[in-house]
Amino acid sequence: ENIYTLDSKGELLITIMSSLAQEESRSISENVTWGHRKRFADGKVSLPYKRFLGYRKGADGLPEIVPEEAEIVRQIYKQFLEGKSYYAIAKNLTDRGIPTPAGKEQWHIRTIGSILTNEKYKGSALLQKKFTVDFLTKKTKVNEGEVPQYYIEESHPAIISPEEFELVQAEMAKR
């Protein structure tokens, strides 16, 4: 733009242009957020496939089960219901050389806990668990009722039956 920044006119132009750019960024952010919320309200579910064990994006764009990974998820639920701890399950998977959802060698108890508490494995989805607080910093926050959440049942194929999922939740509450 050939702006001379050493005089007051140049500084004023830069200030105005940066304000316009920031406003454009805010507008785009609001439009994207609106689009996400519209999809949620319409019951359309998308999963973080790269870090989500047992599912991949199908040819039609919808979640489909990866049989080998789904079997690992079933084993985790089964072992927990047999009385094994998060640590014992994680150690078993690590010892067997099964990679984590992120592709790492070492399983952690947080990963096991996350799999056991994730409603998506029973074919349902709670959407908007987190939301973006500030479009500039991209800071997110756990949704504690500030924005609407959407719970969609039977939104995609289940790996775990709803009954088994509820048994695991009850067992977790007992422990």
Question: Locations of the language-model features?
Answer:
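Conserved catalytic breakage-reunion loop centered on the nucleophilic residue
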Residues: 2-175
